[in-house]
From Swiss-Prot:
Pfam families xref list: ABC_tran, TOBE_2
General function of this protein: Part of the ABC transporter complex UgpBAEC involved in sn-glycerol-3-phosphate (G3P) import. Responsible for energy coupling to the transport system.
Bilayer disposition of the protein: Peripheral membrane protein
GO annotation, biological process: carbohydrate transport; glycerophosphodiester transmembrane transport
Listed name of the protein: sn-glycerol-3-phosphate import ATP-binding protein UgpC
Quaternary structure and interacting proteins, as annotated: The complex is composed of two ATP-binding proteins (UgpC), two transmembrane proteins (UgpA and UgpE) and a solute-binding protein (UgpB).
UniProt-listed Enzyme Commission number(s): 7.6.2.10
Compartments it resides in: Cell inner membrane
Reactions the enzyme catalyzes: sn-glycerol 3-phosphate(out) + ATP + H2O = sn-glycerol 3-phosphate(in) + ADP + phosphate + H(+)
MF terms in GO: ABC-type glycerol-3-phosphate transporter activity; ATP binding; ATP hydrolysis activity
InterPro entries recorded: AAA+_ATPase (IPR003593), ABC_transporter-like_ATP-bd (IPR003439), ABC_transporter-like_CS (IPR017871), ABC_transpr_MalK-like (IPR015855), ABC_transpr_MalK/UgpC-like (IPR047641), Mo/tungstate-bd_C_term_dom (IPR008995), NA-bd_OB-fold (IPR012340), P-loop_NTPase (IPR027417)
Organism phylogeny: Bacteria, Pseudomonadati, Pseudomonadota, Alphaproteobacteria, Hyphomicrobiales
Amino acid sequence: MATITLKDVHKTYHGDIAAIRGVSLAIADGEFIVLVGPSGCGKSTLLRMIAGLESITSGEISIGDRVVNGLEPSERDIAMVFQNYALYPHMTVRQNLSYGLKNRNTPKEEIERRIAKAAKSLEIEPFLDRKPRQLSGGQRQRVAMGRAIVREPAAFLFDEPLSNLDAKLRVQMRVEIKRLQRALGTTSVYVTHDQLEAMTLADRLVVLNGGRIEQVGTPIELYENPATAFVATFIGSPSMNLLDLNTGNAAWSAPAALVGKPGLATIGIRPEDITLAGDTDGGERFRARVRVGAVELVGAESYVHGTLANGEPLVFRVAGRSRMMIDEEVEVAAVAGSLHWFDAAGRRL
């Protein structure tokens, strides 16, 4: 196990295309960090730089007490789990697990001990003599994780390992990965574009945008106190509603105390914090009339997609099956404590 430290790391392609812009990050020993952001934000590039698969243009990366800028991947004491499993198709599961250890001249007894331990923890003991083509997608991903575990590395690096699995398997494997990481206590860096996956796995989230860090914090910190409008809309599903004060607030009303902050340009409200007006307790409130455009039933709740009088979209949640009709007008409200405020640059006020 080890700490991982990045100091002012940059990555530039062809001299002027900046993929990573001055990233600094300290990852504690045993911590599970998730790098999350939209496509092209630099999360996979950053992971590959930690792994040594991608060179850095400037800055410093340390694993434990060693600066690893000039070290090969095999010298960094890390193990990586890829999106495409990267299993040898002509080898059995047992051979896939042992291959890297044999190349490092690990004693046979130690190889068998590590394989037995990993196979038991991952529940792949019945499959040790099968080849990858005889396994399901979830079983292959477990084998890929097992190959990383038997290395007993200082850190695990995960590059979107669940993206090839169906929704049910993704949930199962999320739980499995978190359980294993806690049991092993190994420092882990995980890349995903799926904010739900990020929220459920991470000790801390690192939200990237355009090669820069937007915010670092626990999932609940980022959800409840997003530092920027970008983080506010990226973390949470459906996204936070952002209402632009520059378009005029004739479509909604709120006490002056809620909208009179100096520099205020945008108000944010999460869909789950909006209720039908009659369901909201008293006190200072945001209120608006919404024309219903669509209703999504997602089981125990529904999401209503509508528009305000000025054309701005608004999404809100209602319990159970909504009886609202398309083009119906309803009044909604939100209490003062649920509002978020951002300036013209998208920074939290």
